[in-house]
Amino acid sequence: MSQKQLWYEKLHSSFGQYFSIKEVLYRDKTDHQDLIIFDTEEFGRVMALNHVVQTTERDEFIYHEMMTHVPLLAHGDAKKVLIIGGGDGGILREVCRHAGVKEIIMVEIDQDVVNLCQEYFPHHHAGAYDDPRFQLKIDDGAHFVEQTNHRFDLIISDSTDPIGPGEHLFKSSFYQACRRILNAGGLFVAQNGVCFLQQTEVINTYQRLMPYFSDVSFYQAAIPTYYGGIMTFAWASENANLRRIGLNDLESRFADSGLKSCRYYNPFVHFASFALPQYLIEALAKKAPK
């Protein structure tokens, strides 16, 4: 009996997770990062960049639904959406489900990620790249937000961790530029790692967003392959009421949206996602401006 091939993630140096590989589908170095796509028994196809899991077929819906429907339904009338990163197509797929959105721009630094995910993860994008509202720009997201004259109602930063190509998407200058290109009433959200294991990252984001937005907070979801507890998503706007919408209003917006086949998101999950664990509340309070 042949020994199974194992792949070990290298996000943390002293602990981690591994996957038993059925088949390596692709492995190479792009212009920006090491990329591997492999098939597994438990999680289907998996993509990792620089030895860190980015997405899996089995649980991607949790991440993509929460990164998309929470801010879109909280905003209530977003017409123009900017996606930073998101080359696997999952965020795009979910944004395209909102008929009220009229323009979607996605800025991805790595063309190879887009091409390979279209080939190996067809259910992630589900044809969304052909949506007439969509434009793809191959560029560094930090450079794009510094230079663009476009304005947006929602910015979704679907970045990697703050290492390698994704490092610039966690800097104060990036958040300042995002604030500049948001319309009045606009909203910014970003993935921010697993707060129990990456609390420094969460606190850094909080401190760097505070100078540019009057309301900065986080919401959360549990995503199995982002192990170690709940994953946090940064939330920044000029209107604190956007994260305080009542359950009745959320149910009404959800019903009107036509989102009938969500697998994770619902208005109750949305409402509850802003409830943060006490250790995180206390850590953020220590860093809040006096």
From Swiss-Prot:
What gene name is given for the protein in this entry?
A: speE
Q: What top-tier enzyme class does this entry carry? A: transferase
Q: Name one GO cellular component term.
A: cytosol
Q: In which pathway does it act?
A: Amine and polyamine biosynthesis; spermidine biosynthesis; spermidine from putrescine: step 1/1
> What does the record give as the organism's lineage?
Bacteria, Pseudomonadati, Pseudomonadota, Gammaproteobacteria, Enterobacterales
Q: What is this protein called?
A: Polyamine aminopropyltransferase
Record HAMAP family = Spermidine_synth
Highest taxon above the source species? Bacteria
Keywords, in A-Z order: Cytoplasm, Polyamine biosynthesis, Spermidine biosynthesis, Transferase
Which residues does UniProt call coiled coil?
none
Q: Which reaction does it catalyse?
A: S-adenosyl 3-(methylsulfanyl)propylamine + putrescine = S-methyl-5'-thioadenosine + spermidine + H(+)
Gene Ontology terms describing biological process: spermidine biosynthetic process
The subunit field of the Swiss-Prot or TrEMBL record says:
Homodimer or homotetramer.
What is this protein for, i.e. what is its function? Catalyzes the irreversible transfer of a propylamine group from the amino donor S-adenosylmethioninamine (decarboxy-AdoMet) to putrescine (1,4-diaminobutane) to yield spermidine.
Chief location bin: cytoplasm
| Stated family | Belongs to the spermidine/spermine synthase family.
